[in-house]
From Swiss-Prot:
It catalyses: an organic molecule + reduced [NADPH--hemoprotein reductase] + O2 = an alcohol + oxidized [NADPH--hemoprotein reductase] + H2O + H(+). Its EC number is 1.14.14.1. GO terms for molecular function: heme binding; iron ion binding; steroid 17-alpha-monooxygenase activity. Its main location: endoplasmic reticulum. The gene is cyp1a1. It is found in: Endoplasmic reticulum membrane; Microsome membrane. Cytochromes P450 are a group of heme-thiolate monooxygenases. They oxidize a variety of structurally unrelated compounds, including steroids, fatty acids, and xenobiotics. It holds the Pfam family p450. This is Cytochrome P450 1A1.
Length: 521
């Protein structure tokens, strides 16, 4: 996080810097003087002693999820650090997190009013907005309903399908052809480069009813912007934690604004096109579904929450922006793990061959018959923990947790990485072992163990796209494992070191893939 301070150096005069530092020192001393009183019967939060102005930033390092996990061993599952001038409560341990986000869900359902969050989707993002009142709930419910209507099977047998499945099957088939072509031409491929475009095409199909060529510059540009967005948000903006910096010029913040404006312009253009071709009797995609709902609400005089055209753009922007980063990261990591563990890759292929066969594509309805694949995905989410934290929460009122007093409007970090690597919860947590989720005979996934994995948050702010994301990861993997055998490049070491961000990516690399013998054309 200290690295994020660097863009300010050199862009501000010495006199401006001195004024800013003096102001921050005065504010810090005033805040220390008026320190919150602790109600009788409760304790003050433990935690490391902060430095003036910068707080505990130096102690977080480049991998804050590891640093905060180490701190939890010393201070417990509820402790406080200070980032810049903002107090932050860090929660770990599955029992503590469930208590906060489920049993005391209303008290921890807020989002902190971070400066950078105000510019995400014009401050009206479902995921980042501080709002949690009626309008926010109505928009969240509407977005969830629209997602479900295009991604839910009406039955559990192969003859049933849904829009999500159709798009994944189409893109999965194209991805296999694309990788085969690249392998013949270049001898290797960048897994992230091709997977992310395929996944982006699925959400484009769901939201906009269109797909793009893998080399389409507009789509490639948006994918790149999404990657930048995750990096900036994950690193933390200094102005979020030292308010005076909001008024100083920042190249990084200027770039962040550009990213968000580009996303909004892209979605606005497509939503406008949908309005001109909208037909109530032919709902083509999620955007049409939202427009239809909006028109119905405008005609309904008794409706408590009117949905403006601007809010439709906001919802679609949210769904599109979040619709491919998590899934593409999960799939890219999955391919890396397949290469790192060839014996597991072979078991997965054998399961698909035995339960699905090789004469047709796997489908969503096959999922219950592929328990080892489901266990593999759970172990990917747990072991990689590429979503190390949830988006920060915030307390909505003065509250307490585990006997500690937490004031209203306190920023709260949920350390998902710690939960997924807690030795009290997992046997040998550092080892990659999908079998940990299977029943003794390997015939089914232990649901209780699966629910221990934390990747999509919990409670009122839980990711609305979780079910879709899990289904998408499952079906893409089943399709490519059935057709392709992934291999490392001879002589090159596979680097599984994560790079920190909102979603942690592996380092870009190249791999090899061959068509399975019975799938050769």
């Amino acid at each position: 996080m200290m690295l994020m301070m660097l863009p300010f150096i050199g862009s501000v005069s010495v006199s401006e810097s001195l004024v800013a530092m003096t102001t921050m020192c005065l504010v810090y001393l005033i805040l220390k003087f008026f320190q919150t009183e602790i109600p009788e019967g409760l304790r003050r939060l433990p935690g490391p002693k902060p430095l003036p102005i910068i707080g505990n930033v130096l102690g977080l390092g480049s991998k804050p999820y590891l640093s905060l996990t180490a701190m939890s061993k010393r201070y417990g599952h509820v402790f406080q650090i200070q980032i810049g001038m903002r107090p932050v409560v860090v929660l770990s341990g599955t029992g503590t997190v469930r208590q906060a986000l489920i049993k005391q869900g209303d008290e921890f359902a807020g989002r902190p009013d971070l400066y950078s969050f105000r510019f995400i989707n014009a401050g009206k993002s479902l995921a980042f907005s501080t709002d949690q009142a009626g309008v926010w709930r109505a928009r969240r419910k509407l977005a969830y309903s629209a997602l479900r209507s295009f991604s839910t099977l009406e039955g559990t047998t192969p003859e049933y399908s849904c829009v999500l499945e159709e798009h994944i099957c189409k893109e999965g088939e194209y991805l296999i052809k694309q990788l085969n072509t690249v392998m013949k031409a270049d001898g290797s491929f960048d897994p992230f480069r091709h997977i992310v475009v395929s996944v982006a095409n699925v959400i484009c199909g769901m939201c906009f009813g269109r797909r793009y060529d893998h080399d389409d510059q507009e789509l490639v540009s948006l994918v790149t912007l999404s990657d930048e967005f995750g990096r900036v948000v994950g690193s933390g903006n200094p102005a979020d934690f030292i308010p005076i910096l909001q008024y100083l010029p920042s190249a990084e913040m200027k770039n962040f604004l550009r990213i968000n404006e580009h996303f909004t312009e892209f979605v606005q253009k497509i939503v406008t096109e949908h309005y001109t071709t909208f037909n109530k009797d032919n709902i083509r995609d999620i955007t049409d579904s939202l427009i239809d709902h909006c028109e119905d609400r405008k005609l309904d005089e008794n409706s408590n929450v009117q949905m403006s055209d601007e809010k439709i753009v906001g919802i679609v922007n949210d769904l599109f922006g979040a619709g491919f980063d998590t899934v593409s990261t999960a799939l890219s990591w999955s391919v890396m793990y397949l290469v790192a563990h060839p014996e597991i890759q072979e078991r997965l292929y054998q399961e698909i061959e035995d339960k699905v066969g090789l004469d047709r594509m796997p489908l969503l309805s096959d999922k219950p018959n592929l328990p080892f694949l489901e266990a593999f995905i759970l172990e990917i989410l747990r072991h990689s923990s590429f979503l190390p934290f949830t988006i920060p929460h915030c307390t909505t009122k003065d509250t307490s947790l585990n006997g500690y007093f937490i004031p209203k409007d306190t920023c709260v970090f949920i350390n998902q990485w710690q939960i997924n690597h807690d030795p009290e919860l997992w046997k040998d947590p550092s080892s990659f072992n999908p079998d940990r989720f299977l029943s003794a005979d390997g015939s089914e996934v232990n649901k209780l163990d699966g629910e221990k994995v934390m990747a999509f948050g919990m409670g009122k702010r839980r990711c609305i796209g979780e079910v879709i994301a899990r289904n998408e990861v499952y079906l893409f993997l089943a399709i490519i494992i059935q057709k392709l055998h992934f291999l490392p490049i001879p002589g090159e070491k596979l680097d599984m070191t994560p790079e920190y961000g909102l979603t942690m990516k592996h380092k870009r690399c190249h791999l090899k893939a061959t068509m399975r013998a019975r799938n050769e054309h």
